[in-house]
Amino acid sequence: MANNKISLKARLILYHKGKILLLRQTKPNGGNYTLVGGNVESYEYARQSLIRESHEEAGILLKEKDLKLVHVLHKKDKNAHRIVLYFKAYRWEGDLKARETHKFNEAEWFDLDRLPRNLTDTIRHVLVEYRKGNFYSEM
């Protein structure tokens, strides 16, 4: 029987005035734009993780009731599976800025029709699938 490794992540599609929030990674981390979010720790549920990550990475405060699951991505490689849950929100509080400066150097709002070229491949894939109305995709 195979010994599959599975990881669970949660990411945020945060809207404000018709645009979505993206964080730009520092050069050592790729220099690309990505969504807020990360690993769901063993003591957390996905929305709790996203609330924590959003505050750590972008200085924003979210409430569980404002997070709606809109997409599930299943990624796999030779040795592992990764499930990523994407939540949408329109409400938030706080002082928005890239806070984990060793990982991110900017927080910016982008129109879904004018996304930056240097968006991570995974995030680009998910946003295309999400806009098509697809709740689930594989990569």
Go through the PLM ranges and name each one.
Residues 1-21, 70-72:
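Conserved N-terminal beta-strand and adjoining loop/helix that marks the start
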Residues 8, 16, 73-96, 108, ...:
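Active-site-adjacent beta-strand/loop module that shapes the phosphate/pyrophosphate-binding cleft
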Residues 16-56:
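Conserved Nudix-box catalytic region and its N-terminal flanking loop in Nudix hydrolases
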Residues 27, 75-79, 101-102:
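A short beta-turn/loop motif at secondary-structure boundaries
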Residues 34, 68, 86:
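Conserved beta-strand segments that form the floor/walls of ligand-binding pockets within enzyme
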Residues 61-71:
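A short coil-to-beta-strand element that immediately follows conserved catalytic motifs
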Residues 98-131:
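NUDIX/MutT-family hydrolases
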Residues 132-139:
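Acidic/histidine-enriched, glycine/proline-rich intrinsically disordered or flexible terminal extensions
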